[in-house]
Amino acid sequence: MVRVEKIKTKKGKRVLVNRASKTVENDKKALFCRGAKTNEIISHAMMDLFDMKKPLTTKMDKHNPYHLFEDETPIVRAGSKFDTSLFVLGSNSKKKPNCLTFGRTYDGQLLDMAELRITSYKSSSNFEAAKMTLGSKPCVILEGAAFESDGDMKRIGNLMVDWFRGPKVDTVRLEGLETVIVFTALDETNLALRVYRPMLKKSATATPRVELAEMGPSISFEVMRKKLADDALFKLACKKPKALMKKRRKNLSEDVFGNQLARVHVGKQRTDDIQTRKVKALRKTPLVEAAPENAIE
């Protein structure tokens, strides 16, 4: 736990209020940390990831000799200090070269963590497409049968979506969708990251024709080590506050198109007892018998 002294300034009080638990949490920030040793590949890859996550980022400039799979306490403590729930650690060693460790925390403890080794890397500077706009909302896509068949890969895919989803927004207009991040599970141990920019072209119809231009970075990973939370802790982390849950309404359902269908129960009505307005035009008039045509007076 991080020791917090008594706050004496208004700015310090605002910081504590911003870090406190909320019904609607703030957008998740990512902490970028370099291990004891890094190389050019790790440095450039982390710079590309840093540009993709801005402005929800915090960087630790110094090298840190963290061994997360032996002791995750330092990174959890650093996350509490900088108010970040996501982190990535870049390291390079003889036994485990070119490794990026992605992780996330929950309630002051480690939730999920996966060590991915870079097998191939192409920087975003090698692509001619326009780069990602600061603060834009990306579209994250998971493809591959391993994300559904393998339990660990399914959790790693969930971690990647949580890591790269960007700020929370209610709606995104078509022209505002500028980035598509695709994670492809080649098998249970290999993962590919590709980043594209949608290009809206003219078409014969009102709907534009969409083409994808790769904008980078392009990274292929091999899953090395992983430390995933148990089902009970993961379920607790995904639990929604009661204040955000909609109350169930009786006799109300929703079809596949989003239309609400309701059923109203009405008792038997006795129309004879209903007092209606009596209008002269609607009054019954007595029938007058017509005289026969051949009648003689």
Curated annotation (Swiss-Prot):
It is found in: Nucleus, Nucleolus. InterPro entries: Brix (IPR007109), Rpf2 (IPR039770). Signal peptide: none annotated. One of its GO terms (molecular function) is rRNA binding. Its main location: nucleus. Keywords: Nucleus. Residues 28-232 form the Brix domain. GO terms for biological process: maturation of LSU-rRNA from tricistronic rRNA transcript (SSU-rRNA, 5.8S rRNA, LSU-rRNA); ribosomal large subunit assembly. It holds the Pfam family Brix. PROSITE patterns: BRIX. It comes from the Eukaryota. This is Ribosome production factor 2 homolog. It comes from Caenorhabditis elegans. The lineage of its organism: Eukaryota, Metazoa, Ecdysozoa, Nematoda, Chromadorea.
